[in-house]
C-alpha cells in the first residue's frame, strides 16, 4: 500500500510520497531520518501548494487548528483521490477525521504515534525536501504566521480580560494576610502603653483609627472619639485610659506606632476598593457564575484554572473538586473515597446545606456552574443586552437550586456566606457595629448592704414514706350540711394510730435483727432484699459474703449438671433395654 505524508508548513501544503511502503513499521526509522540525506532517501516531494499571502496563510492555518478542511487542501488531496490502495499520514487526528469525511475519499488515514519520528525529521529538514525554499525565508514566514495566529486567537476585547480577575483575587488574598499581620503588630506594640484597649475593642481597623486619633492615653480627656466609636464604648475607653496599668512611652515610639497604624487604615480602605472592583469585573465577565457561587468563589475558580476559557472547557466533575487536587490524588493512591468538593465548598448554597446534603448540593451546583461558564465564555451578546439578560441563566438556576435545597432540608433558607438574591444581585452586607466585649463584673462579688452573710444551715429535705389512704366507707351517709358524723372521724383517727404503732413495731424488729447480724438497718434491708441473709434454727440472722454466694451458685450449677448427666444415662439405658426387647420379639416371630 502506497504511503503519502501530508505536511502543513507556514509556506504552504506539502504532499510527500514514501519510497518504502512499510516505512512506518521500520525499527531504524529514527536513526535513518536523523540527517538530511537520510530523509531524502526515505521520502520525495509529490506536490507543493504555496500560500499566496500572509492573510491566506492565516486563514488556512486557523481552519486547520479547528479541524476543518479548506478548499485549497481539498484540491491538493484530489491528486491522490483516484489512486488505489493508498494510505495518508496526518499529524493531527482531528484533521484526519475531517479528511475521512470528504465525499469520494477512500483513503486509509494514519494519525497515531507511529508517525511521530517521520514528521519530526520532515520538519527539521524541510528546506532540503522542497526546492527553492531557503531556511531564512522559512523561519521568517513561521514567525510572522505565529504572530498573526496569536492575534487571531486572542480576539481582544476589554470586557473579556479575565487576567484582571486573576490578579485582583490574588492581591485580595495577599492584602488580607498583610492586614492581619500589621494589625496584630499594632495591638502588641500599643498594648504596652494601653493594654486594656485590646479587651474593649475587637475590630482591628477601629483600633488603628483610635491609636491615630488619641495618641498618648493621657489625651483621653481632649480626644473626640465619636467618629470612631459609639457613645457607650467611648465612655468605656476613656474610663479605662484614666486608670490604665500600661507603661509610659516616648513621643518617638508613638510616632512609629502611628505610622504602622496608618498603614493598617490605608490597607483596609484599599481592600474595600479592590473588593468593589472585583465584584464589578466578575459581574461583567462571568455574570452567570457570579449569580451561582458569588464573586469571590467564582474569581478563585477562574484563577485556579488560569482563565475563563479554560474553566469553561472543564466538566462539572472537575469544577466540583477544583482546588482539592492533593486530596484527590492521595485518595486515588490509597484507594480511599475521593473528595466531594474543593473551592466550590465556600459557596453560600453549599454552606446552607447540612452535612448529609452538602455533597449532593456540590454536585448539582457544579453542573449548573459549568453550563453558566460556557454561556459566559462563548456567548455573544448584542449591544442592547442588559446585565439581567446576560445573567438570566445563572439567576434562574440559583432560584431552582434554592427551592431544591429547601425541599431537601425541609426548612426555609437562611442567608449565609456570599449572599446573592434571586435576581442575581449581591445583597449588601449589614452596617458594621462595634459591640462592647463582656468584662468581669467585680460588683457581683460584694455583699448586699453592710450585713454579713447569713450562716444559717439549709434544712435538708426529709424523706416521707408514702402512707396508704384509707378507703371511705360507702355506708356513711353525709349530713344535710355536707359534713359527716363525728363517729366516722373518730374511727379514722383510731385506724391511723394503729398503723403508726404497727410501723414502729416493724422498725424496732428490723433494728434488733440488724444488731444481731452486725449490720446497719440500711445494709440489712439491702442484703435481705438480695437474699444475702440466712437464719439459723433459733431464728438468728447472719450475713453471707459475695464470695460465699458465688461458691454456692457454682456448687448448685455443678449439682444440676450432674443430675442432668445421670438422667441422660438412665434414659440411654432404658432406650438400650427397649431395643434389645424389640430384637428378641423379632427373632421369636421369625422362628
Swiss-Prot record:
* Organism of this sequence: Aspergillus fumigatus (strain ATCC MYA-4609 / CBS 101355 / FGSC A1100 / Af293)
Q: Which GO terms describe its biological process?
A: box C/D sno(s)RNA 3'-end processing; endonucleolytic cleavage in 5'-ETS of tricistronic rRNA transcript (SSU-rRNA, 5.8S rRNA, LSU-rRNA); endonucleolytic cleavage in ITS1 to separate SSU-rRNA from 5.8S rRNA and LSU-rRNA from tricistronic rRNA transcript (SSU-rRNA, 5.8S rRNA, LSU-rRNA); endonucleolytic cleavage to generate mature 5'-end of SSU-rRNA from (SSU-rRNA, 5.8S rRNA, LSU-rRNA); protein localization to nucleolus; snoRNA guided rRNA 2'-O-methylation
Q: Where is the sequence biased in composition, kind Basic residues?
A: 581-591
Mind telling me what this protein is named?
Answer: Nucleolar protein 58
Question: Which SMART domains does its entry note?
Answer: NOSIC (SM00931)
Instruction: Identify the InterPro entries for this entry.
Output: Nop56/Nop58, NOP58/56_N, Nop_C, Nop_dom, Nop_dom_sf, NOSIC
Stretches the record annotates as Disordered:
437-591
Ranges of biased composition (kind: Acidic residues): 463-475
Does Lyase appear among the keywords?
no
Q: Describe the function of this protein.
A: Required for pre-18S rRNA processing. May bind microtubules.
Q: Which GO terms describe its molecular function?
A: snoRNA binding; snRNA binding
Question: What GO CC terms are in its UniProt record?
Answer: box C/D methylation guide snoRNP complex; nucleolus; small-subunit processome
Q: Name one Pfam family in it.
A: NOP5NT
The UniProt record lists the Nop domain at: 285-410
Which SUPFAM superfamilies has this protein been placed in? Nop domain
Amino acid at each position: 500500500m502506497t504511503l503519502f505524508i501530508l505536511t502543513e508548513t507556514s509556506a504552504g501544503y506539502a504532499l510527500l510520497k514514501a519510497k518504502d511502503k512499510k516505512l512506518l513499521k521500520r525499527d531504524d526509522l529514527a536513526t535513518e531520518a536523523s540527517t538530511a540525506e537520510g530523509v531524502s532517501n526515505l521520502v520525495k516531494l509529490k506536490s507543493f501548494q504555496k500560500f499566496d499571502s500572509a492573510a491566506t496563510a492565516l486563514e488556512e492555518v486557523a481552519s486547520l487548528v479547528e479541524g476543518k478542511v479548506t478548499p485549497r487542501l481539498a484540491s491538493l488531496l484530489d491528486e491522490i483521490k483516484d489512486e488505489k490502495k493508498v494510505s495518508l499520514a496526518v499529524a493531527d487526528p482531528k484533521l484526519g477525521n475531517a479528511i475521512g469525511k470528504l465525499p469520494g475519499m477512500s483513503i486509509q488515514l494514519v494519525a497515531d504515534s507511529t508517525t511521530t519520528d517521520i514528521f519530526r525529521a520532515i520538519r527539521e529538514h524541510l528546506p532540503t525536501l522542497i526546492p527553492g525554499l531557503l531556511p531564512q525565508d522559512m523561519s521568517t514566514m513561521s514567525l510572522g504566521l505565529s504572530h498573526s495566529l496569536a492575534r487571531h486567537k486572542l480576539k481582544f476585547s476589554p470586557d473579556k480580560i479575565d487576567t484582571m480577575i486573576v490578579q485582583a483575587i490574588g492581591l485580595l488574598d495577599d492584602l488580607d494576610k498583610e492586614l492581619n499581620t500589621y494589625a496584630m503588630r499594632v495591638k502588641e506594640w500599643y498594648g504596652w502603653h494601653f493594654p486594656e484597649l485590646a479587651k474593649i475593642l475587637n475590630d482591628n481597623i477601629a483600633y488603628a483609627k483610635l491609636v491615630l486619633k488619641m495618641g498618648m492615653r493621657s489625651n483621653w480627656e481632649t480626644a473626640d472619639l465619636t467618629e470612631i466609636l459609639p457613645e457607650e464604648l467611648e465612655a468605656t475607653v476613656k474610663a479605662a485610659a484614666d486608670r490604665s496599668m500600661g507603661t509610659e512611652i516616648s513621643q518617638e515610639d508613638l510616632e512609629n506606632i502611628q505610622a504602622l497604624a496608618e498603614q493598617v487604615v490605608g490597607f483596609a480602605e484599599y481592600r474595600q476598593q479592590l473588593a468593589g472592583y472585583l465584584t464589578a469585573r466578575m459581574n461583567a465577565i462571568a455574570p452567570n457564575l457570579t449569580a451561582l457561587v458569588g464573586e469571590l468563589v467564582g474569581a478563585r475558580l477562574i484563577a485556579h484554572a488560569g482563565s475563563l476559557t479554560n474553566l469553561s472547557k472543564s466538566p462539572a466533575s472537575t469544577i466540583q473538586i477544583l482546588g482539592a487536587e492533593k486530596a484527590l490524588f492521595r485518595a486515588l493512591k490509597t484507594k480511599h473515597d475521593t473528595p466531594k468538593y474543593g473551592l466550590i465548598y465556600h459557596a453560600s448554597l453549599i454552606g446552607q446545606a447540612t452535612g448529609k446534603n452538602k455533597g449532593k448540593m456540590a454536585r448539582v451546583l457544579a453542573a449548573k456552574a459549568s453550563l453558566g461558564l460556557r454561556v459566559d465564555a462563548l456567548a455573544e451578546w448584542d449591544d442592547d443586552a442588559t446585565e439581567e439578560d446576560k445573567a438570566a441563566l445563572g439567576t434562574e438556576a440559583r432560584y431552582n437550586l434554592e427551592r431544591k435545597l429547601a425541599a431537601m432540608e425541609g426548612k426555609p433558607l437562611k442567608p449565609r456566606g456570599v449572599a446573592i438574591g434571586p435576581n442575581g444581585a449581591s445583597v449588601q452586607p449589614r452596617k458594621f457595629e462595634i459591640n462592647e466585649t463582656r468584662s468581669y463584673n467585680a460588683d457581683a462579688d460584694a455583699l448586699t448592704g453592710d450585713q454579713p452573710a447569713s450562716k444559717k444551715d439549709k434544712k435538708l429535705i426529709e424523706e416521707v414514706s408514702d402512707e396508704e389512704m384509707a378507703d371511705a366507707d360507702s355506708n356513711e351517709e353525709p349530713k344535710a350540711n355536707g359534713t359527716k358524723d363525728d363517729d366516722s372521724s373518730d374511727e379514722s383517727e383510731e385506724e391511723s394510730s394503729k398503723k403508726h404503732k404497727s410501723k414502729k413495731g416493724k422498725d424496732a424488729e428490723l433494728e434488733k435483727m440488724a444488731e444481731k447480724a452486725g449490720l446497719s438497718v440500711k445494709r440489712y434491708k439491702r442484703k435481705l432484699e438480695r437474699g444475702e441473709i440466712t437464719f439459723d434454727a433459733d431464728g438468728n440472722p447472719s450475713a453471707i459474703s459475695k464470695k460465699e454466694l458465688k461458691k454456692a451458685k457454682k456448687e448448685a450449677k455443678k449439682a444440676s449438671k450432674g443430675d442432668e448427666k445421670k438422667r441422660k444415662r438412665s434414659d440411654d439405658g432404658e432406650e438400650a433395654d427397649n431395643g434389645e426387647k424389640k430384637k428378641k420379639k423379632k427373632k421369636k416371630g421369625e422362628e
